């Protein structure tokens, strides 16, 4: 779970922890994997959750490669999950985060006390038209999720995880595989 949740919504974060969520930190993910726990990672994080609705058919990790390094270090396969409909539960019209970050660099404070990571303008419940990463109730739409076959890589270990070119190749493989599966899922349900 995004570490900002613990600062902004500590009550929600505590409830999520009761059902097994952990803070999105590599140290905690490594501990979980070494206990042979399944670890569900959202590489795109809050930017993926609040990306504009017109990007819903795209796999967006925003260059985040930590999940690849983690898998390589811990000799773990990546089991992709993709879904159709999740971005219809909230209609994000635009993300004003880049403009907000620019204003922050000029000295203006964040409107949310901390760096929000995303600042969407969206239509959703219960607010109607809302601005900012606020908690919301999902719109009632059908969701279709597919758990894809595991992806393994030819090389694992510290050396593989520290080779930027190899990490990029693994990242590209995962992203492309997930995009192909997402395209198939959209074709099946639209």
Question: For the regions a protein language model found, what residue spans apply to each?
Answer:
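Hydrophobic/aromatic beta-strand patches that form the interior of the parallel beta-sheet core
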Residues: 1, 22, 79-81, 145
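Catalytic core of membrane glycerolipid acyltransferases/transacylases, capturing the structured
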Residues: 1-35, 45-63
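Alpha-helical membrane-anchoring segments
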Residues: 1-6, 11-13, 17, 171-190
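Structural element of the ATP-grasp superfamily
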Residues: 16, 70-71, 147
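Extracellular/periplasmic catalytic domains that process cell-envelope and extracellular macromolecules
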Residues: 32-35, 73, 138-140
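Membrane-associated lipid acylation/remodeling enzymes share a hydrophobic transmembrane-juxtamembrane segment
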Residues: 38-133
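Conserved catalytic or regulatory cores that recognize and/or transform ribose-phosphate-containing ligands
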Residues: 91-188
């Amino acid at each position: 779970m995004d570490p900002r949740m613990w600062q902004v919504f500590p009550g929600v974060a505590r409830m999520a922890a009761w059902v097994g969520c952990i803070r999105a930190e590599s140290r905690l993910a490594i501990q979980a994997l070494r206990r042979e726990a399944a670890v569900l990672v959202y590489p795109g994080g809050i930017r993926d959750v609040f990306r504009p609705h017109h990007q819903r058919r795209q796999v967006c990790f925003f260059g985040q490669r930590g999940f690849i390094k983690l898998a390589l270090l811990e000799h773990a396969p990546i089991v992709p999950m993709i879904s159709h409909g999740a971005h219809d539960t909230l209609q994000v019209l635009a993300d004003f985060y880049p403009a907000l970050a620019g204003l922050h660099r000029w000295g203006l404070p964040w409107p949310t006390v901390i760096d929000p990571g995303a600042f969407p303008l969206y239509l959703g419940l219960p607010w109607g038209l809302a601005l900012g990463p606020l908690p919301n109730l999902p719109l009632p739409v059908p969701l279709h999720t597919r758990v894809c076959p595991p992806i393994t890589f030819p090389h694992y270990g510290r050396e593989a995880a520290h080779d930027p070119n190899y990490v990029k190749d693994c990242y590209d493989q995962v992203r492309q595989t997930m995009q192909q599966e997402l395209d198939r899922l959209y074709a099946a349900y639209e």
